[in-house]
Every structure is written in C-alpha cells, then in structure tokens.
Amino acid sequence: MRLATVIVLCSLFLGVSGDGWYSFFREAVQGTWDLWRAYRDNLEANYQNADQYFYARGNYEAQQRGSGGIWAAKIISTSRKYFQGLLNRYYFGIRNHGLETLQATQKAEEWGRSGKNPNHFRPEGLPEKF
C-alpha cells in the first residue's frame, strides 16, 4: 500500500507542469469525466466491436485537456487493465482470457492519448450520435 501511494505521489509530482497544481488537478478531473462519458456512451450504444473506438475517444478527449488529463487517462487505463486481469485470474480462474482484446484496447488507448483521430477505430454503422 505504501509503495502504491509513493508511486501515485511521484507520478503526480512529475506530471505537474509549470501551470501549477490547480490547473493540473482541474485537467485530471475533466479528463476523468471524458473517460466516464466515453464509457457511458459505449454502454448506451451497445454496438458490437465499438469498444476500441470509445476507449480511443475517451483517451483522446482526456489528452486534449492537457497533462492532467493525460495523467488521469494513464492511471485509469492501467488500473482497469490490472483489475480486469485480477478478476480473470482469481475470480473466473482464467489466465489468458481476452488477451488479444486487452492488447487491442491498449493500442486504442495509446492511439487516443497520442492525439490521433479516434475515428480510426470507429466501426461501420455506429450512429452519428456517438
């Protein structure tokens, strides 16, 4: 637990730009909201093979916020990856379940965080609302 706290605090310290703590945390909160909105849209769309698009879109929108948004997107994406791995391994008893999907999701998240257009992952026929 101490190690996790130290890692989070160090990443916070290194992630803060010259703009100050307030803008960094504001960007982080807004980036978290962007990821949440993309997740909610993914659930609402309920469209097959659209997960990568929504992951890329959420990370792209968080990246547009600034360094705080990028930091929040990395923390949330990494936490989701590890939590999903723990669930698969210890709760479901499956070690490599969804490994290809997880790697494709990571690629989409990195694509969005790098500032590239998330529509690269947009599936055909997804309603324009999303």
Curated annotation (Swiss-Prot):
Subcellular location: Secreted
One Pfam match: SAA
Entry protein name: Serum amyloid A-4 protein
SUBUNIT field: Apolipoprotein of the HDL complex.
Signal peptide from the UniProt entry: 1-18
Region described as Disordered: spans on this chain: 109-130
Keyword RNA-binding: no
Disease: Reactive, secondary amyloidosis is characterized by the extracellular accumulation in various tissues of the SAA protein. These deposits are highly insoluble and resistant to proteolysis; they disrupt tissue structure and compromise function.
Keyword annotations from UniProtKB, A to Z: Acute phase, Amyloid, HDL, Secreted, Signal
Annotated Basic and acidic residues bias: 121-130
Induction per the UniProt record: Upon cytokine stimulation.
PANTHER family the UniProt entry points to: SERUM AMYLOID A (PTHR23424), SERUM AMYLOID A PROTEIN (PTHR23424:SF29)
